[in-house]
Amino acid sequence: MAQGILGKKIGMTQMFNEQGEIIPITIVDVSANVVLQQKNVAIDGYNATQIGFDDKKDKITTKPMLGHFKKAKTTPKRFIKEIIFKKENISSLSALAVGDQVSCDLFQVGDLVDVTGTSKGKGFAGVIKRHNQSRGPETHGSRHHRRPGSMGPIKGKIKGKKLPGQMGHQTVTIQNLVLFSVDNQKNLFLIKGSVPGPNKGFVVIKSAVKKLSKEQANAKI
């Protein structure tokens, strides 16, 4: 069953499992998820549930979006995403009415999830840092220390050529992370491993797409 919820990365810590092993944990706040719109094949061409997360002020919200939030009888939201699901993968989100709160009970401890976020921006970086290329000679008259090397033919550009440029600040998805614990009172997810993006960054948590074998799943847990 396809499930999804929005959250904000709080930070990382570590916990002990039942075997006494130290497990790296990412804490994600999933409180105040509100259903803004339900989409279906007949009207929109696909099935999806639009969710809003994290309040923002009215004065920094456009008038069309203010009307959209007013229909859902909720305050303006900073982070809006659609949880798309196929007809055969019916989600319990589709049963919620517009304006309803999305509970963290959608997921259970031990579930495998895919977490999508925006990676940390590193700014302009060279090929050694950005693409892990080897550096050139440092002595004996060489001037090719950290240069990218040949650009290819004079005419035209080669698609996919590894060159210096913006590093990071891209949409990244980490698959098959284990939901280590769920705090229903504080609406917190404790996810085993790292999650893309900085602290206070928004993330989308969905049910894992790729199925693992029993051996792989046990190794994850």
Swiss-Prot record:
Q: Which biological processes are named by the entry's GO terms? A: translation
Q: Show the Pfam families listed in the entry.
A: Ribosomal_L3
Entry-linked Gene3D superfamilies: 3.30.160.810, Translation factors
SUPFAM superfamilies (UniProt xref) = Translation proteins
Molecular-function GO terms, alphabetical: rRNA binding; structural constituent of ribosome
Residue spans crossing the bilayer: none
In terms of superkingdom, the source organism counts as Bacteria
Family in the record: Belongs to the universal ribosomal protein uL3 family.
Q: Where is this region: Disordered?
A: 131-165
Coiled-coil spans are none
Q: Name one GO cellular component term.
A: cytosolic large ribosomal subunit
Q: How does it assemble?
A: Part of the 50S ribosomal subunit. Forms a cluster with proteins L14 and L19.
Please give the function described in this protein's UniProt entry.
One of the primary rRNA binding proteins, it binds directly near the 3'-end of the 23S rRNA, where it nucleates assembly of the 50S subunit.
- Entry annotated with the keyword Zinc: no
Q: Which organism is it from?
A: Phytoplasma australiense
| Record keywords, A-Z | Ribonucleoprotein, Ribosomal protein, RNA-binding, rRNA-binding
**What is this protein called in UniProt?**
Large ribosomal subunit protein uL3
